Amino acid sequence: MTEFTHINQQGHAKMVDVSDKQITKRTAVAHSSITVNKTIFKQISNNTNTKGNVLNTAQIAGIMAAKNTSTIIPMCHPLPLTGIDVHFSWDETNAPLYTLNIQTTVSTTGKTGVEMEALTAASATALTIYDMTKAVDKGMIIGETYLESKSGGKSGDFQRQSNQ
């Protein structure tokens, strides 16, 4: 069983010391989603929401969230991120409900991974879409948020299998 690395000998929280770790390229990809009704789907697709361009605003929120992860997740190291990207794709197969899939990719060259930054970006992106469209319908559903893949670092690569 793996030990918790964020607990010191007295049982208190600590931030892990990464001083001796090797600098490597690290990338993480995360996923989230939000399911909306037809009215919101059309507003987002046609850019007619009264608050502005929902997807552009959500993309910026996701990028800002990744950059600020260490300020909201207590044991995360502040990292010099080298790339952040947010992609959207619609799933229209369950109309009149529409699911907007969110994929975030975060990269760095450093001593610790960017999984939390990618997950935070995906979450904040979904939350921003909810915030910008909640006046139309508060019944939206933010879906599962999970790590799709990660590369680099001592623990090696990870790729989520479809049955995970």
Swiss-Prot record:
Coiled coil: none annotated. It catalyses: (8S)-3',8-cyclo-7,8-dihydroguanosine 5'-triphosphate = cyclic pyranopterin phosphate + diphosphate. Its EC number is 4.6.1.17. The active site is at D131. Substrate binds at M75, C76, H77, M116, E117. GO terms for molecular function: cyclic pyranopterin monophosphate synthase activity. Pathway: Cofactor biosynthesis; molybdopterin biosynthesis. Keywords: Lyase, Molybdenum cofactor biosynthesis. CDD domains: MoaC_PE (cd01420). GO terms for biological process: Mo-molybdopterin cofactor biosynthetic process. Homohexamer; trimer of dimers. HAMAP family: MoaC_B (MF_01224_B). Belongs to the MoaC family. Catalyzes the conversion of (8S)-3',8-cyclo-7,8-dihydroguanosine 5'-triphosphate to cyclic pyranopterin monophosphate (cPMP). This is Cyclic pyranopterin monophosphate synthase.
